[in-house]
């Protein structure tokens, strides 16, 4: 029988489905709800030492719907990191670990360009019992104005330095969360892994403008008549996320074997998860999907992933992790392969043609005649 249980960076997860950082992990109550529903791990909403600087606005979401069915497939947010005090988070980390000692609790953390601040937040979170860290180097809105989030993640030199600060003191596994708002995601990936990070999480949201209201002529989501570009997620980003995960997995395999990848971007079903794992992910994160469909989607997701494994006779996630990466190549190689395949097919067809009268066979007379004909 196949199993979804897996061990990632020494963390034992009952399944690879992880609550991604955001509203679904915004306090102890909802984190507990996620564990009760059966999620493999939970990443809290990003925390910082100075939550008093975080001020959210309303509304802060805008959604894109199918013209035909009305289903939500695109989601923009201009939400910031947690506005709850760091002391409150430390208290709730302890409460969660006391109530769910086997639950894998991952702290998403973000700070300004300050070595002491990064050392402090890591040390205090570890004392509170968190099992791992995800470094939010990738939020595309609001925080970059303070040189945080994507402002760090877009600069490989700064990223490597800050990840290095964290690795100086961290005693738990560390994942660096990548911004997709770069030309080559391999560059920040290498920077994070050179600094010693245990894994990569990708992707965070894509900087975007969801649309403009044609009645008010104001862009969405509108706050007092104005807005700011936000982060785009949901089903629509999955093709971009898959491409970037494939690129990251290729870097890991070739240059940093043993490091891990947590795939993020539009995942709502077990089949979605299977695609990310086939392209090299060890775990998959779901955030917008939970906001759209609820915490209980983890059950059908597990069932669907197990059904996929049974169909292909895979017993463990490791049996198919990264399997499909091998089928990516260059366009020049595609042309070469197609040219060779057509030549081979033409040669095979030529073999079936009669070259001399002695080769005519009464049993295959019609087929032999057709082989010699055009049209």
Q: How would you name each of these model-derived features?
A:
Residues 263-264, 319-327:
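A glycine-rich phosphate-binding loop feature that marks nucleotide/adenosyl-phosphate handling sites
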Residues 51-68, 209-229, 291-314:
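C-terminal helical cap(s) of enzyme catalytic domains, especially alpha/beta-barrels
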Residues 275-286, 291, 296-299:
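Structured C-terminal cap/extension of enzyme domains
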Residues 17-20, 105-108, 174-178, 262-263, ...:
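Short catalytic-loop micro-motif centered on adjacent basic/acidic residues
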Residues 1-106, 110-115, 119-120, 301, ...:
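N-terminal capping/small domains of soluble enzymes
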Residues 252, 261-264, 285-287, 293:
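Helical hairpin unit composed of two closely spaced alpha helices linked by a short loop
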Residues 45-47, 137, 204, 288-289:
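Short secondary-structure boundary segments
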Residues 32-37, 41, 98-99, 112-262, ...:
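Alpha/beta enzyme core
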């Amino acid at each position: 029988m196949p199993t979804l249980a897996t061990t990632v960076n020494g963390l034992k997860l009952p399944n690879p489905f992880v609550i991604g950082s955001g509203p679904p992990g915004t306090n102890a109550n909802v984190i507990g709800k996620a564990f009760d529903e059966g999620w493999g791990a939970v990443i809290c909403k990003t925390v910082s030492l100075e939550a008093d600087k975080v001020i959210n606005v309303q509304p802060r979401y805008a959604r894109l719907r199918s013209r035909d069915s009305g289903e939500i497939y695109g989601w923009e947010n201009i939400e910031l990191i947690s506005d709850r005090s760091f002391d409150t988070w430390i208290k709730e980390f302890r409460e969660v670990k006391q109530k769910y000692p086997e639950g894998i609790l991952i702290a998403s953390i973000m700070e300004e360009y300050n070595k002491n601040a990064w050392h402090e937040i890591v040390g205090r979170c570890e004392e509170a019992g968190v099992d791992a860290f995800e470094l939010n180097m990738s939020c595309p809105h609001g925080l970059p104005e303070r040189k945080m989030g994507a402002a760090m993640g877009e600069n490989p030199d700064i990223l490597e330095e800050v990840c290095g600060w964290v690795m100086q003191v961290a005693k738990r596994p560390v994942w660096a969360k990548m911004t997709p708002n770069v030309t080559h995601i391999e560059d920040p990936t290498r920077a994070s892994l050179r600094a010693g990070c245990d894994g990569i999480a990708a992707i965070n949201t894509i900087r975007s403008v969801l649309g403009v209201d044609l009645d008010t002529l104001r862009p969405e989501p509108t706050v007092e008549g104005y807005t700011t570009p936000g982060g785009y997620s949901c089903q629509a980003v999955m093709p971009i996320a898959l491409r970037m995960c494939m690129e990251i997995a290729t870097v890991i395999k070739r240059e940093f074997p043993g490091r891990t990848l947590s795939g993020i971007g539009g995942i709502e079903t077990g089949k979605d998860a299977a695609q990310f794992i086939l392209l090299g992910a060890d775990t998959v994160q779901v955030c917008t999907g939970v906001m759209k469909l609820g915490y209980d989607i983890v059950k059908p997701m597990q069932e669907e992933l197990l059904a996929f494994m049974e169909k292909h006779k895979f017993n463990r996630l490791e049996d198919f992790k990264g399997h499909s990466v091998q089928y990516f190549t260059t366009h020049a190689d595609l042309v070469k392969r197609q040219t060779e395949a057509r030549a081979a097919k033409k040669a095979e067809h030529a073999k079936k043609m009669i070259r001399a009268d002695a080769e005519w066979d009464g049993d295959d007379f019609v087929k032999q005649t057709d082989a010699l004909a055009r049209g």
